[in-house]
């Protein structure tokens, strides 16, 4: 992968971390735990929660497990992101989003021992999540799209 593309994908990851940590800082500064504020009526609200587990609060309180999983996931993503064998923009963009999301939640776990969640979709019954979670989800979808529909063409 050319140096400029490597930098671009790292910038994407960095932007995810900055957006994630910036919104989390805003929420912590302006909300109390459980506070809800409508952003777009019927669509999106901010609701401040502290999650010491993973998705759906599974493995609650298992910080050592989350540290190990995060470090391993970062290593795997960085390996594939910088491996010249994998040079598709969709695959690499997906990995960059996943990397930024993992780092965003890892920062919370290291400093706070929990992850700050705040995004609530009001039009569907779904867990409250954050920007890092969204980046991981979108990134994984992009990687799967590449693997299912495009990888044999490369």
Curated annotation (Swiss-Prot):
Keyword list, A-Z: Aspartyl protease, Cell membrane, Hydrolase, Membrane, Protease, Transmembrane, Transmembrane helix
MF (Gene Ontology): aspartic-type endopeptidase activity
Catalyzed chemical reaction(s): Release of signal peptides from bacterial membrane prolipoproteins. Hydrolyzes -Xaa-Yaa-Zaa-|-(S,diacylglyceryl)Cys-, in which Xaa is hydrophobic (preferably Leu), and Yaa (Ala or Ser) and Zaa (Gly or Ala) have small, neutral side chains
GO CC term, one of those recorded: plasma membrane
Signal peptide annotation: none
Membrane topology annotation: Multi-pass membrane protein
Main location (coarse class): membrane
GO biological process: proteolysis
Listed EC numbers: 3.4.23.36
InterPro entries tied to this protein: Peptidase_A8 (IPR001872)
Locations listed in the record: Cell membrane
NCBIfam families xrefs: lspA (TIGR00077)
Job description of the protein: This protein specifically catalyzes the removal of signal peptides from prolipoproteins.
Name of the protein this chain belongs to: Lipoprotein signal peptidase
Organism lineage string: Bacteria, Bacillati, Bacillota, Bacilli, Lactobacillales
